[in-house]
């Protein structure tokens, strides 16, 4: 793929991970910006399989195959998400923020690193 595209590995091959992969593909429909390279999953039984045309790898395998890839966290359970954050951060890897182009937001909204905001979301400041 083009060197201008940002490689993204989606951590989590379950429901939210697959939804996140679709969200990233939907972002690309508006402006081709990302290259989805794989799913990362801790379930070793999934390693080597293909889901929605993407290979499923372990974290170390993914980093070896795609050392420049940013991570998008597609893990829905809060405790598991914290564990993923710690594991990825401990390896010195970075999370990508994904904001769909059809998000409406105030210019005063601050979005943190690794945030995922889906299409149709409206963000505003309330008092």
Feature roles, as predicted:
Residues 1-2, 65, 109:
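Short, flexible hinge/linker loops that cap or flank conserved catalytic cores
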Residues 4-24:
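Glycine-rich adenosine-cofactor-binding loop
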Residues 7-9, 35-37, 68-71:
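Short active-site oxyanion
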Residues 11, 27-48:
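NAD(P)-binding Rossmann-fold cofactor-contacting core
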Residues 15-18, 79-80, 110:
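Short alpha-helical
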Residues 24-28, 88:
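Active-site catalytic pocket residues across diverse enzymes, especially alpha/beta-hydrolases
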Residues 44-105:
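Phosphate-bearing ligand-interacting subdomains
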Residues 97, 103, 109, 113-121, ...:
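A structural motif detector for beta-strand N-caps
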